[in-house]
């Protein structure tokens, strides 16, 4: 994730590793699901709004994109090490703002990380055909 590309190399991110029991219990308030509580650790992927690059032609801010790229690097690295991850973004933003109070930083995703249980059901991922997503002009 540290080597992930970002717009104008701003690297507008911070990653908070949540490992202690107390911190996990606070995090669970923002996303209260049974399966989510089973992870041994979580990584909260934060965007630094004051460091994000903005495209001048349409004022599109690229912070979420940059954090997403770095976060996916993290998920791919975990997968390479036979660890499971899940992208969680349906969390309570008010609770997250209270847990991580900062004028500049905002949570983009929470990534639970852990070993995949042997009895975990494995479903085949449904992906669009390459012809549906790639166009040559």
Regions flagged by a language model, labelled:
Residues 20, 97-98, 104:
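Short Asp/Glu-rich motifs
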Residues 10-13, 80-83, 108:
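Short secondary-structure junction motifs
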Residues 3-70:
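Glycine/small-residue-rich phosphate/adenosyl-binding loop
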Residues 47, 90, 115:
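Short secondary-structure boundary segments
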Residues 4-7, 77, 103:
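Histidine kinase transmitter module recognition
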Residues 1, 43, 58-99, 111:
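Small-aliphatic-rich amphipathic alpha-helix that forms the alpha element of a beta-alpha
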Residues 35-42, 101-122:
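A glycine-rich helix N-cap at a beta->alpha junction
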Residues 51, 109-137:
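C-terminal helix-cap and adjacent tail motif
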């Amino acid at each position: 994730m540290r080597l992930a590309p970002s717009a104008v190399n701003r690297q507008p991110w911070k990653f908070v590793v949540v490992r202690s029991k107390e911190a996990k219990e606070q995090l669970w308030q923002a996303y209260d699901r049974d399966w989510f509580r089973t992870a041994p650790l979580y990584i909260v992927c934060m965007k630094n709004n004051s460091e994000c690059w903005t495209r001048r032609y349409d004022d599109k801010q690229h912070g979420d994109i940059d954090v997403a790229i770095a976060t996916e690097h993290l998920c791919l690295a975990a997968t390479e090490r036979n660890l499971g991850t899940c992208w969680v973004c349906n969390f309570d933003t008010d609770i997250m703002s209270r847990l991580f109070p900062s004028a500049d930083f905002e949570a983009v995703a929470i990534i639970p990380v852990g070993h995949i249980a042997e009895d975990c059901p494995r479903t085949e991922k449904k992906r669009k055909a390459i012809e549906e997503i790639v166009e040559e002009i």
